[in-house]
Amino acid sequence: MLLENYAVAGILVLYAILILSSVTVVVLENRQPAKTMAWILVLILLPVVGWVAYYFFGQNIRKGHRINKHTEPLYLHDARFGNAPEQRIDRALMPLSQLVYNCGGSAVSAGNGLTLLGNGRAFLDALSEAIASARSYVYLQTYILAADAVGETVADLLLAKAAEGVDVRLLYDDVGCWNTRDSYFRRLARGGVKVAAFLPVRFPTLTDKVNYRNHRKICVVDGTLAFVGGMNLAERYLSPSWHDLHLRLTGPAAAALGHIFTTDWESVVKSNRRSSAASTPVPAAEPPTAAPPPCTAEVTVRDALVQIISPSPLSVMSEMECALVWILLNARRYVYMQTPYFMPTEPVLGAMQTAAMSGVDVRLMIPEKPDGFWLRWSGYSYVTEMLRAGVRVYFFRPGFLHSKTIVSDDRLCSIGSGNIDFRSLENNFETNAIIYDRPMAAAVRRVFEADMEHCREILREAWDRRPLLHRLLESNARIVSPLF
């Protein structure tokens, strides 16, 4: 009996030590209070499950070696791609451009040609045309690359250019491509394409890499032509039910996107020895000197001011979050926002409420049925706060809304890979183009207004009458959302 008591006491002491040490680690990471308390509760109330969850998903990328510490200095932007004279920037928007520059070093560039691509077919056609025109290099970076008909089309294009002696590089996110068979990438590597996976996740190194993903969608051709936006490379993006936007750019902004690619590539080369290109350095992207090939699609804007932002979890302050808050708090007439996933950080949530209550027409469009159970209900949990503040909320009904756009006052807009959620604002590597151009902003506004025709506007009176079960699902989903 005495031995049994000692054994029980020893187990309790060990349990207390483990709990105390785990809580201490979480506290020392200095997260937002809500996240800290959420993890503490999980670790205390669910000791085994909580430890496993924290081990896989909760560790801070800025601690230890989540990304090789020697590569962190690479994530400093290069201002040489910014060539816009101050007098060309709207005086009212200069504080925004300065804010973004101070957050990440990204400057405004002039002389950019822009084409808005409003569906997957238009994007794939423009991308195929661009890759086929390559003479020096093709840098392709994506979150999802499926081994389906679209993936095979892209593979054939890349292999054909590699056979011509063009420097072809593919950087894909390992988690985003979990469902893509390895033989697909081996085929590309055998054909001369330099292939690399961003933060590969394989046991036993799963622990610190699941939660910080490279969500960028970039393609750069010869430093003169580039693409950025929300579309990955898979058949479902060609479906009429999939609604998304992408941007084709020519000019200095294309070279800036090339610099982002080379930064990520060097990071992978230094930390990922599984890559087929681990020992092959990539040349630094230079501002373009030659004119890009013409686009068969109509070019919407020919001389736009563009500022490329590339927030990452290594940033001291998120350029995307800072820019979004500034846009909301400085809007005069309206801010329209589209995002497939809506779980805003406290600064963004507060800015949306403040803008709406100040008389600005703030509108939020999200899919009626996001592609995830918890994503759906956690997003819904913010609708009541939006409606109470005067934000107009729209649920996109036909298919899935995947666009990530912001437009304000017909004077600026943003298009890219970043969602308005915790992951994009804090955890992921993203890329967006902030466009200081009235014609392009007006075009994005018209897209939003056209999409409104396919939406159900949520009215506060009806929303307040939703079933109790829905409210419980929303509240519980929101409780766990800060964990990740």
Where are the regions that the model predicts?
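Histidine/acidic-residue-rich catalytic or RNA/ligand-binding cores of hydrolases
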Residues: 346-349, 376-378, 408, 426
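Short alpha-helical functional segments enriched in proximate histidine and acidic residues
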Residues: 338
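Active-site donor-binding acidic/aromatic loop of nucleotide-activated sugar
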Residues: 393-397
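Catalytic-core elements of nucleic-acid end-processing and repair enzymes
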Residues: 404
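N-terminal localization/anchoring segments of enzymes in phospholipid and broader phosphate metabolism
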Residues: 1-322, 326, 330, 354, ...
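Helical hairpin unit composed of two closely spaced alpha helices linked by a short loop
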Residues: 331, 341-363, 367-368, 372
